Each structure stands twice: as C-alpha cells, then as structure tokens.
Amino acid sequence: MLQRETKRSKFHFYGTSSGAIRAAAFAQAQPEAVDRLVLVAFTYKGTGSPTLRDRAKQVEFYRANNRRTRDRAMIRSIFTRDNLASSYDMAVADAMADEELKFGDQVPTGTYLDMTANLPLVDPTKIPSPVARIRGDHDGIATMGDLFDFYRQLPNGDRVFISLPNTAHSPGFANNRHLLWYATHAFLAAPTPVAG
C-alpha cells in the first residue's frame, strides 16, 4: 500500500528496543525496501548486558508461557532499571502505564525469550542500507562492545554510532529526547553520498 500510495520503492525505518531488532530484521530480509535505518536501544548478541542477564533468570518461564505480566511496576521499571531515573519525568512513566493498562496487563513473551535465548537475531553483514545506531549512555540492554561489534560489520560506510548523554534505555521518553530527535532527523535528512 505504501508503495502504491507514495510511488516510492524505498522507505526510512526506525525501531527502538525490540522494535529495533524487528526493523533490522526487516532490513535484512527486504533490503530493497529500506532507504535509511535508525536503530535505537538495540541489542545484538547481548554480551555483557546487565538487563539481559537479569531477564535470563526467567528464561524457562518465557519458554513455558506465551504471556508475561506487564503491570504498572514493570512499566515503571523501564524508566528506573538503568539507575538513571533522574533522566526521566516519572509522570511520563505513569501516563504511559495509565494508557497501556487500559488494554490489560499481559503481553506476549516472545521478545523476552528471543533476547534471552535466541540472540543474535540479525546479521549486520546482510544490511546494506545506511544505518544510525543510537543509544543512551546508561542503557543496560547492550554494552558498547556488543554494539560496536554489530556496527563494525555493517557493509555500508554511510553509518553513524551515537551515544546520548545522561540517557538510559528509552530515549524517546527521556528528558534529553530532543537529542534523539536531532540525531534522527540529521541522519534521515542527510544528502545521498556521491560515489567516488
């Protein structure tokens, strides 16, 4: 539908956290449809991740159950787990919980199982598009080493790695979210490189 309505064959894609894994997997599977790709709060192999180490303690639960609890405490923990709660206005976490919980307090376990037992889900060598890798400098979902391992294998030289200061796992909700939007806009609006 997008191709039909816009008459375009390629599009920019943006994903954050498990959505970043999905966006990268799409870019790997359908590279002809991806113009520029922005991956925020992404994890590659999970090597050294304190968040995934804690989450892995429940891997057998994730294998045995197709749903997990996502209650108010869990939603608030997204904003506090990286020991930088001061980078958020917790009223945002509460507003998010208020809206999400209208639809229930259960979500599929699939992404948690994938992140604790099935990484890596994406092969960076199979993503030919330009890529922006953006992370909060306090994000516990992935280490810098894990992310640089992914970044260095990307085949396209049109790539950037951006670390946002005083920011944790959810930069789009953080007090410094303007830095995320600035970096994203700059990358998506970049001129097309001229071949040498």
Where are these regions (language model features)?
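Short, amphipathic alpha-helical "lid/cap" segments that border enzyme active or binding sites
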Residues: 177-185
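Catalytic histidine-centered segment of alpha/beta-hydrolase-like enzymes
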Residues: 167-178
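Conserved acidic catalytic loop of the alpha/beta-hydrolase fold
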Residues: 1-10
